[in-house]
């Protein structure tokens, strides 16, 4: 069985701190934390979401 190098990452809204999204992140190619502007249902706006560990 092949071991997976992809890691599950949870994205958290910087304004309301709600955990809205979970994504698969390549552990070998991306060493920095993800920062993506996505829609937050709690804030009802597009806000910056950062990866948690």
Swiss-Prot record:
Q: Which UniProt keywords apply?
A: Ribonucleoprotein, Ribosomal protein
- Enumerate the Gene Ontology biological process terms: translation
Q: Which GO terms describe its molecular function?
A: structural constituent of ribosome
User: Can you cite an annotated GO cellular component?
Assistant: ribonucleoprotein complex
Q: Which family does it belong to?
A: Belongs to the bacterial ribosomal protein bL33 family.
**By its UniProt entry, which HAMAP family does this protein fall under?**
Ribosomal_bL33
Q: What is the protein name given in its UniProt record? A: Large ribosomal subunit protein bL33B
Whose protein is this, by species?
A: Mycoplasma capricolum subsp. capricolum (strain California kid / ATCC 27343 / NCTC 10154)
Source species taxonomy: Bacteria, Bacillati, Mycoplasmatota, Mollicutes, Mycoplasmataceae
């Amino acid at each position: 069985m092949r071991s997976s190098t992809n890691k599950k990452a949870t994205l958290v809204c910087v304004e309301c701190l709600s955990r809205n999204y979970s994504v698969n992140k390549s552990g070998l190619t991306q060493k920095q934390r993800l920062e993506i502007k996505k829609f937050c249902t709690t804030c009802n706006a597009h806000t910056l979401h950062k990866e948690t560990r």
